């Protein structure tokens, strides 16, 4: 059955998957959502016998219904290849009885690679299907990981250009180095004087600037988005939840149909929303455990039913989760409002006006599958140290937030029998200083690359290629701008 995509903010004409991917954001500023969530049409047993690529096809074909089998399989083959340093693409590592789903084996060693290695292929296929002649300009705001993963995905992809905005003082040194050393004539990286929310708001504003869109069209350009507001990012993220269950089943760790919990370190709410969609496709998931850092808007939301961004923005050791406006939550709000675009639009207007909104009791009741909690900086560091001491497994700061929240969940609920998958979203090599300092304060005196070698030793893991590459790479991007000058910067880059 065909899946069409509606905006979360108005009842316009639904669009096909390829059109939603090309546009990124709907014209009314809303996000595209599937008109229904398709059910898995392969049994769990069948899925458990498949490779990652095969599972990805079985999931994505159900959402991207206007892609032919050949188109989709080609995209999948090109995305999930030897760019990943393991054949299984997303390995499951057991530590202390929980299963860490390592989503960081792609070229930029964060989970964003899972979707951004396929998005460029989905995008150019969509452009071809829709007879688009314009060059596609990918505009991206990043809290650190999306930027590099999108740059790596789109670099030198014909018919595309990519512009990445990151908060100049809000990413880790390794994240910044990864971005500013990006090669490719079609890439452009800009540090903004502001935080991630400023970058994201600026990008959304540029997207909804109708005059600019017209001007761009005249010069042969059109915008699209590589942020997780693009449905072409969300759908590929559903696949690894299905694959993790398939792996547990294949390895005899779970019984066919037995439910598992999923813990997700959350920022923009894209990753956990993908898990929610997986559950709605029929994957046996019990609780969706949403883990936040000190920017605990989501924890407060799940507890009180009020989403309130009026608070201090905290810079933490898990920068990819330093977010006060979780964009993808809008897709969940729309759904629990009964797919009511008017209601959702009202709440989003309150969010942009007063910085907060409150959901009804009925809507709150529809969130029963979610459990929210958070870990502060000390708890996050302690969790890295605790897990390393107990079993030698080293996790990054984001994964540590999830792991610490899982410990809180266990304590609160006693639910230790349910098998639990913890999304491990970045390699510890990406946040080496925070990780090593958490393990022992003595490491603070070492340089970034000395720490990399030390981490390799204590974790008994070879240094990933992504880190080796930046040791000596020259800086090729040094543009900075104020948050309110983002549009001018874009125009300069495009020479319009
Ligand atoms: C992006 C990111 C997150 C947050 O994911 P969302 O989909 O934005 O909730 C968590 N951890 C890491 C390492 C990330 O890069």
PLM regions: where:
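PLP-dependent amino-acid enzyme catalytic core
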Residues: 1-496
